[in-house]
């Protein structure tokens, strides 16, 4: 396994970060570095807001400057959670252009890149009532219909497959059974299975006590490099937080 993991994503990555860190540490040892650009509702190309917190688009964050600054190291990159921009009303072509930009930037530091698609089967099995419920909770400003979202998601999935083939990325199809009542967030009981598969490691590699709730809480509370709270910008330099069980983490 590589010495450095670079992960891009949104809510699923926020929820699965403790598992991802534990799996990376189990596979690569206690010196592994994890750099993650993530956040609830995170957009690849636009500013995103969750409650009172605002984050720049992944393409606009400080991760890319940090990758240029750090010395070269064997790296695996993960591009995940690419569907939020559909819910924000961006077209399939715009969404794919942002993902392509991210992939091309990552290819400057590694050719080991995993790209996940969208859980289209989970979306398609939604009833109209459930769709309206989740839309009102997750993206209350969205006015797209279920049919429109499913059609755009299908176009994005086709584009992701073409991008993976053209750029030599490893495309990972998200499993339908990873999702339950919530159509876009992986079930908590399957975080370990899902994120180990996305990372490319075995689920049995994580020691029983390695993915502790204390570390998970600490990771959840760590601030990203640049964010706004109630309109006030907050900058937190990311020199790398050392974790007690091993590994260093930088968040953007």
Feature map (PLM): residue ranges:
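N-terminal secretory targeting modules
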Residues: 1-40, 132-140, 205-252
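Conserved SGNH/GDSL esterase-like catalytic core that processes O-acyl groups on lipids
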Residues: 2-97, 242
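Alpha-helical cap/lid subdomain in secreted, periplasmic
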Residues: 60-189, 193-197, 201-206, 211, ...
């Amino acid at each position: 396994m590589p010495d450095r993991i670079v992960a891009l994503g949104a809510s699923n990555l926020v929820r699965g970060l403790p598992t991802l860190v534990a799996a990376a540490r189990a596979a690569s040892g206690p010196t592994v570095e994890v750099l993650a650009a993530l956040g609830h509702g995170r957009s690849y190309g636009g500013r995103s807001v969750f409650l009172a917190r605002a984050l720049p688009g992944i393409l606009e964050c400080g991760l890319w400057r940090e990758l240029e600054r750090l010395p070269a190291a064997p790296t695996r990159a993960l591009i995940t959670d690419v569907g939020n921009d559909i819910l924000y009303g961006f077209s399939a072509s715009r969404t794919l252009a942002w993902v392509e930009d991210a992939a091309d930037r990552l290819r400057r530091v590694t050719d080991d890149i995993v790209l996940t698609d969208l859980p289209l089967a989970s979306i398609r099995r939604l009833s109209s009532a459930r769709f309206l419920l989740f839309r009102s909770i997750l993206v209350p400003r969205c006015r797209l219909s279920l049919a429109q979202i499913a059609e755009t998601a299908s176009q994005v999935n086709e584009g992701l497959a073409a991008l993976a083939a053209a750029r030599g990325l490893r495309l990972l199809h998200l499993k339908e059974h990873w999702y339950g009542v919530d159509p876009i967030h992986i079930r908590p009981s399957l975080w370990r299975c899902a994120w180990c598969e996305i990372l490319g490691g075995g689920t049995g590699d994580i020691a029983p006590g390695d993915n502790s709730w204390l570390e998970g809480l600490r990771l959840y509370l760590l601030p990203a490099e640049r964010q706004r709270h109630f309109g006030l910008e907050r900058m937190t330099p990311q020199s790398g937080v050392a974790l007690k069980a091993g590994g260093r983490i930088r968040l953007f």
